[in-house]
Regions:
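Short, well-ordered alpha-helical segments in soluble proteins
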Residues: 19-22, 43-46, 68, 72
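Phosphate-handling substructures
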Residues: 1-38
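Acidic, low-complexity terminal tails and accessory targeting/binding regions
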Residues: 2-9, 48-50, 63-112
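Beta-strand elements within well-structured catalytic alpha/beta cores of enzymes
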Residues: 46-56, 60
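A short, acidic, amphipathic alpha-helical segment used as a generic capping/interface helix at domain edges
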Residues: 35-48
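Aromatic-acidic/polar surface patches that form glycan- and anion
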Residues: 28-32, 54, 79
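N-terminal start-of-chain detector that recognizes signal peptides
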Residues: 24-27, 59-63
């Protein structure tokens, strides 16, 4: 993760904070858009009906998710993604959608 992105956003931070940083148009926005493009490129290589798994870590996931779903209610997504959590993105003829994948609260772990 480039230092200017981490300096602008920090981690762990709630999705609302991350979305505000992306909206500001600085280093976090550029990185988020690059991440979203990369994920979309990977999805474009998957055959119809297929799936891909992308494994990443803190802040990469949040930034890419915000940029992939810019019209979502990011504040409703809550806190940062923890270990073994993520987002399921769907790219199809109807557009793009996503669902956060969370562990039960008692099993969540977020450390930096």
């Amino acid at each position: 993760l480039p230092d200017p992105v981490y300096a602008e956003v920090g981690w762990p931070r709630p999705f609302a904070h991350i979305a505000a940083a992306v909206a500001a148009g600085g280093p976090a926005a550029r990185f988020a858009k690059e991440q979203a493009r990369l994920w979309e490129d990977i999805a474009g290589q998957v055959p119809d009906g297929g799936r891909a798994l992308i494994v990443s870590h803190g802040l990469f996931v949040e930034l890419g998710a915000v940029a992939s779903l810019p019209d979502a209610d990011h504040a409703a997504w809550g806190e940062a993604i923890g270990y073994c959590e993520g987002i399921r993105l769907v790219y199809d003829s109807d557009g793009r959608g996503g669902t956060l994948l969370r562990l039960p609260e008692e099993n969540r772990l977020i450390e930096n």
